[in-house]
Amino acid sequence: MVNNIKTRRAKFLEKINNNSIVILFSGKHNPNTNDDFFVNRNFFYLSNISQENSYLVFLKKNNKFEEYIFIDKQDKKLEKWFGKKLSSIDVNAISGIKKNNILTNDIFEKKINFLLQENKIENIYLDLHNNENVINEIKTKYSNYKIFDCYAIISELRMIKDDCEINNVIKAINITNLGFKRIIRELKLKKNNKKEFEIFNAFNNEILNHGTHEIAFKSIIASGINACYLHYPTPYATILKNDLLLCDVGSAFNHYASDITRTIPVNGKFSQQQKKIYEIVLACNKKIIELIKPGITIEYLQKKAKSFLSQQCLEKKIIKKKFEINKYYYHNVSHYLGLDVHDVCVKTKLKPGMVITVEPGLYIKEKKIGIRIEDDILITKNGHKCLSSMIAKEIKDIEKLYL
């Protein structure tokens, strides 16, 4: 793992101008809301450190690099409230940065000023996309230097996953599969007046019991007509026995996300009408996955998905004219996946090592049916690999889970 992190840093620093300093900030916990701390993903990508109020600093001069990390001093009083902070030994083991270059925040400003002056630095790189007050203060304080945004450079690197990153995504998907099976078990209990939030809680509890400390995003558990709202936020409705239940869910492992959607019959059997629509979406899901290989674009996949869905809906008399598909399909078929659920990207063709989703859907309000089927796909040298193929999506396989 540490070697992977070192390799990422080396690739990043190759793209930075000489006579430059890079400053990345991990972010700060908000004490007013007491929300969980969410580490800056670019900081984590290059350090493997998730601790708040930490700085990662790189110096590049004459094509030689120095790396520093600044952390909070360990404080026995604060430790009683919030637990132990990382020590320099911990940081060295996790990040691979030399022990002598692991410093404390009380000397951060002094050290930065020394590095700038001693090395006649001309450029400062900051992650300006993540609009932290701390970064804005640094930008203002050192405005006499050339300021560059390193967000796009890191984004381009993050798009290509190394083996360690891919394994993290696979672990997250495997845990999500366990959560999906828990959803089925919960539905099999056949309790009257079951609420969407009961399924929501069952999934979240299951994945937290299986080695992940993170839910990748707020689970979308939507029954009946609620499945027609893409980011349905309020899972409080009663689930009716003849409904379909759309479950857009994902765990994260070591901050790497999975993103899976399955649409299942509450009573264990698809009706004929539900089957008709489900089979169109499933065929589209499989068709788009077949097309994936290096050299194509996500925009191409979207065009093909929309064309396929409109043609199928015409043939099945769901619409009368092709343009009417916009009423029933109104989102993109794919996005990048990684440290963020909707991961960073620059407009480019697909390359080996990228991970994307494939998630066609149809949302027919008048029939109270919303169906989406989403898989996570790794781009390989010769094509693709579906990382979520173990999660049932064929009608017969889903119905078999209820037996």
Where are these regions (language model features)?
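Active-site neighborhoods and metal-handling regions in enzymes and metal-associated proteins
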Residues: M1-L403
